Amino acid sequence: QKPKLLYCSNGGYFLRIFPDGKVDGTRDRSDPYIQLQFYAESVGEVYIKSLETGQYLAMDSDGQLYASQSPSEECLFLERLEENNYNTYKSKVHADKDWFVGIKKNGKTKPGSRTHFGQKAILFLPLPVSSD
């Protein structure tokens, strides 16, 4: 599996995972913290791991995104290809609440509790790391 970038259609940000556990979006394609590895747990279920830090994208019980040192149930996301060819990533452990990974127009992460289907903030395009 080649590493990928997660490009958000809302403002053109790449999802970034910092070593300190913070998650946000950046428009800098050369940022080392935006390279992500996807691991399929089962069909449509993925772990998203930072290549640089080795941490996993996770969503806590308040809907906040953070980076986890090890893969837990909070790190499992339901990956779905939508009609517009963008993907959405819904927290599996909070699936009954419909909480999605999202980035706001200012590049900050959107709490899962504030996301809902149809928002641009939750639409992501997995892109290859190299632009060539």
Swiss-Prot record:
CDD domains: beta-trefoil_FGF1. Its main location: secreted. Keywords: Angiogenesis, Cytoplasm, Developmental protein, Differentiation, Growth factor, Heparin-binding, Mitogen, Nucleus, Secreted. It is found in: Secreted; Cytoplasm; Cytoplasm, Cell cortex; Cytoplasm, Cytosol. InterPro entries: Fibroblast_GF_fam, IL1/FGF. SUPFAM superfamilies: Cytokine (SSF50353). The keyword Cytoplasm applies. GO terms for biological process: angiogenesis; branch elongation involved in ureteric bud branching; cell differentiation; fibroblast growth factor receptor signaling pathway; mesonephric epithelium development; positive regulation of angiogenesis; positive regulation of cell division; positive regulation of cell migration. One of its GO terms (molecular function) is S100 protein binding. PROSITE patterns: HBGF_FGF. One of its GO terms (cellular component) is cytosol. Heparin binds at residues 10, 108-120. It comes from the Eukaryota. PANTHER family: FIBROBLAST GROWTH FACTOR (PTHR11486). Belongs to the heparin-binding growth factors family. Plays an important role in the regulation of cell survival, cell division, angiogenesis, cell differentiation and cell migration. Functions as a potent mitogen in vitro. Acts as a ligand for FGFR1 and integrins. Binds to FGFR1 in the presence of heparin leading to FGFR1 dimerization and activation via sequential autophosphorylation on tyrosine residues which act as docking sites for interacting proteins, leading to the activation of several signaling cascades. Binds to integrins. This is Fibroblast growth factor 1. It comes from Notophthalmus viridescens. The lineage of its organism: Eukaryota, Metazoa, Chordata, Craniata, Vertebrata.
